[in-house]
Design a protein with these regions (language model features):
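Acidic-enriched catalytic cores of C-N bond-cleaving enzymes acting on peptides and small amides
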Residues: 208-242, 249, 266-289
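Acidic-glycine-rich active-site phosphate/pyrophosphate-binding loop
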Residues: 92-106, 172, 187-198, 344
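Active-site-adjacent mobile loop/cap segments within catalytic or ligand-binding domains
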Residues: 240-277, 330, 334-344, 349-355
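Flexible, glycine/charged-enriched surface loops at secondary-structure junctions
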Residues: 64, 139-141, 225-238, 282-294, ...
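A short beta-alpha structural unit
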Residues: 34, 38, 73, 237-244, ...
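Acidic/histidine-rich catalytic neighborhood of metal-dependent amide-processing enzymes
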Residues: 115-195, 228-229, 246-248, 259, ...
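Acidic/His- and Gly-rich active-site-bordering loop/insert found
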Residues: 5-110
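Zn-dependent metallopeptidase/amidohydrolase metal-coordination segment
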Residues: 241, 322-383, 388
């Protein structure tokens, strides 16, 4: 392929050819997926997985292979001119503890294992992308900055990518966040979100005490009521409740994990004030101690649907027969938005049982997901996505 950048029609033609050209390299990609997936990487404990990724970068001859203070693994694939830099990132952590059996299996249609789609495949594509580009003789004018990020999920609150972007020494023209599933995912806006945790504890239970779970139920009821009455633009998601030791005794402790989201940052701030008021009132009327902690906080914003970045991405998806999903929000873009960097999130294949130990990803669509990524890189590189 010639070194010059290409207008969009030529990029579309190239993109249509890519799935069949990538297919001979699929075995290499799947090997990286299994190697990466079998390394446990719960949030805050991704070191071994990042070390493997950087080793792959080094083997590919990339520049500036390194691990920063937050454990992010980075490398640069130099462009022909290097006039701008495109960032491709994938989070390394998964929602599975290291005690979970991380053995992966491959069948004719699927790769299965804990975290296969979230986000071992994203990291495997990141690790394999330099080899794919080299084998297919694909060269960008722009530098390609590859980044495996840490501390993304739950209490991590995207700490790794936020640290990198806040301390970057290179100007980033645009960013792409990779998620293993779902193909068709096109996230370019971030909702205002607050992920919270409420923990209720009794030192001792008196006869009149109804227990920690009952108090959480009171809090949930009040929170639902206030959101319904005061914030019609907010949504409450009850993620998990756990606590207690037996069916026959009131629980001495219990925990609620939940999410509130809205298009409006002020709504989230006001909701947090309401939660503090509810918690204080319930605690006052009991002998318990109740603590409310904010675990995740993201601001609203992102790109508009008619932004050239999104328009051209949809052209690429259409050329590959990918139907964009209706949901266009992604927390992966919020950290980019905070730094004024245009970014979107792409899914790479289809899959099942997300965030369960028997999670699995479909093999065949991966070549299409990879073609989508490469096509978009050339569109950004060629100046087809507006000012990026």
């Amino acid at each position: 392929m010639a070194n010059d950048t290409k207008p969009m029609d030529q990029i579309i033609d190239l993109t249509r050819e890519l799935p069949s050209r990538i297919k001979p390299l699929l075995e290499l990609l799947l090997g990286n997926l299994v190697f990466i997936g079998e390394i446990p990487a719960p949030t805050f404990h991704e070191q071994k997985r990042i070390k493997f990724l950087v080793q792959r970068f080094t083997e590919c001859g990339l520049q500036n292979c390194s691990i920063d203070e937050k454990g992010n693994g980075a490398a640069i694939l130099p462009g022909e001119t290097g006039e701008k830099t495109i960032l491709v990132a994938a989070h390394a952590d998964t929602p599975f503890d290291s005690t979970v059996n991380h053995s992966f299996s491959i069948s004719s249609q699927y790769v299965a294992g804990p975290g296969a789609g979230d986000n071992s495949l994203g990291l495997a594509v990141l690790a394999t992308l330099p080899t794919i580009m080299a084998r297919l003789n694909l060269r960008l004018q722009s530098n390609l900055f590859l980044l495996g990020t840490t501390s993304s999920l739950e209490k991590g609150n995207q700490e790794g990518i936020r640290f990198f972007l806040a301390n970057k020494k290179t100007e980033i023209a645009a960013g792409i966040a990779l998620e293993g599933i779902l193909l068709g995912r096109l996230g370019f806006r971030s909702m205002a979100t607050m992920g919270g945790e409420i923990i209720c504890r009794f030192n001792t239970l008196n006869e009149k005490d109804s227990g920690a779970i009952d108090l959480l139920n009171q809090i949930i009821h009040q929170l639902r009521k206030r959101i319904r009455q005061q914030f019609n633009d907010a949504t409450l998601v009850l993620g998990a409740v756990d606590g207690g030791a037996s069916y026959k005794t009131p629980a001495r402790s219990a925990r609620l994990r939940f999410l509130v989201r809205s298009e409006n940052d002020d709504t989230i701030e006001q909701t947090m004030e309401q939660i503090n008021q509810i918690v204080a009132a319930v605690q006052h009327d009991s002998s318990s101690k109740i603590r409310f902690d904010v675990i995740v906080r993201n601001r609203a914003g992102g790109l508009e649907i008619d932004d050239p970045f999104i328009v051209q991405t949809k052209r690429i998806m259409k050329a590959l027969g990918i139907l964009p999903l209706e949901i266009n929000h992604s927390t992966n873009t919020s950290s980019f938005m905070e730094q004024g960097i245009p970014a979107l999130c792409l899914g790479l294949t289809t899959g099942e049982n997300l965030n369960y130990p028997d999670e699995r990803v479909a093999i065949a669509p991966i070549t299409t997901g990879g073609a989508q990524l490469i096509g978009l890189l050339f569109a950004i590189d060629g100046g087809c996505c507006g000012q990026y």
